[in-house]
From Swiss-Prot:
Disulfide bonds: none annotated. This is Phenol 2-monooxygenase, auxiliary component DmpK. Disruption phenotype: Cells lacking this gene cannot grow on phenol. The gene is dmpK. Pfam families: Phenol_hyd_sub. Homotrimer or homotetramer. Interacts with the phenol hydroxylase components DmpL (P1 component) and DmpN (P3 component). It comes from Pseudomonas sp. (strain CF600). Keywords: Aromatic hydrocarbons catabolism, Plasmid. The keyword S-adenosyl-L-methionine does not apply. Coiled coil: none annotated. GO terms for molecular function: phenol 2-monooxygenase activity.
Length: 92
């Protein structure tokens, strides 16, 4: 068995993700921001210009459709139980 020591990335090396929730022409940009793990995010709101600067400063990566779906599925699972189930299982 070979053991490899993979260095853990520092905080500054972690990927920063965004997912825009607002419409493109909205005055304020509503978006999710995550560091390292797309499923652990905060919801933020910034004016358009500030959002652009925020993204440049943080060197963000936009979540693709597959990432967004995985995050949404995970949210449903935690909120309602099994993925896709919105009601408790019938005991009888």
């Amino acid at each position: 068995m070979t053991v490899t020591n993979t260095p853990t990335p520092t905080f500054d090396q972690l990927t920063r993700y965004i997912r825009v929730r607002s419409e493109p022409e909205a005055k304020f940009v509503e978006f999710d921001f995550a560091i390292g793990h797309p499923e652990l995010f905060v919801e933020l709101v910034l004016p358009q210009d500030a959002f652009v600067k925020f993204c440049q400063h943080n060197r963000v990566v936009a979540m693709d459709e597959a990432m967004a779906k995985a995050v949404d599925d995970d949210m449903v699972k935690w909120r309602f139980g099994d993925v896709g189930r919105r009601l408790p299982k019938d005991p009888g």
